[in-house]
Amino acid sequence: VMDRIVVGITGASGIPYGIRLLEILKEFDVEIHLTCSASASLVNKHEGDGRSWKDVLSLADVVHDSKNLASSISSGSFKAKAMVVIPCSGTTLGKLAAGISDNLVTRSALVMLKENRPLILVPRETPLNTIYIENMLKLSKAGALMVPASPAFYNKPKTLDDNINFIVGRVLDLLGYDSDIFSRWEGTE
């Protein structure tokens, strides 16, 4: 049976992280289910690589309307291996920490927590205020995995893509997919 991965893209800065994850997941035997918050397409106009939003959506096998709370991915009976919210806005963190499921991104994420399945959140906000930090702590205690979009420098990144690939590579590690899109730490002598 093919793995199903749910990807949520919010309107936070960091759209290239979500797009790159979709591109790399296509290389694996994975069924990609995508839902995006209402403002994600607007952020893509400013941060994207020039491709249309329609082209971004075409990277997924199934696209779910964020307003459709009756979508298959809104139910615990939908067998998803994991969900990644990338990037994850501060607003989405707050809604999740408060248990508010007012769109399909938040509903699907809360379902992952209640079903005890992996939920990976990639917050991109900086600086972090106390409210964001407390929300991340609350979600971490509830079982979510936090992957802040804080790239490493030990791998000597030369391009923006190197930094994007580092974060996406770490997400892939947590999903259990091997990828060589970033250099791993090999220690010192």
Describe every region a protein language model picked out.
Residues 2-120, 124-189:
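A cross-family phosphate/adenosyl-ligand binding-site feature
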